[in-house]
Amino acid sequence: MYIINLLFRGHAVAIIYVTNQKHIADLKIYREKQKHRADMLVFVEDQKHRAKGDCLWFYTDQKHRADTIIYWEDQKHRADLKIYEVDQRHRAKGSF
């Protein structure tokens, strides 16, 4: 987890931009299919102002407005972080 803290440079994950260019991403993220294997349980907010902390995310189409740029990694062993998306806000947990 130390490397992830360095990549975030003190920013709480909240506003996320997804890129298809691995080399510009701050983090490579793998979507875990099983909740118990994930490093973090993430809830995706539908309103930007509600995305606070590490595990409450809001996706943006504007790269310059994002806190973090991520790349969806299809190989688990190449990912910096494994997440599982939960369907209820109170079930989100995890921090860097």
Feature-to-residue mapping (PLM):
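Repetitive, compositionally biased segments used for assembly/scaffolding
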Residues: 2-96
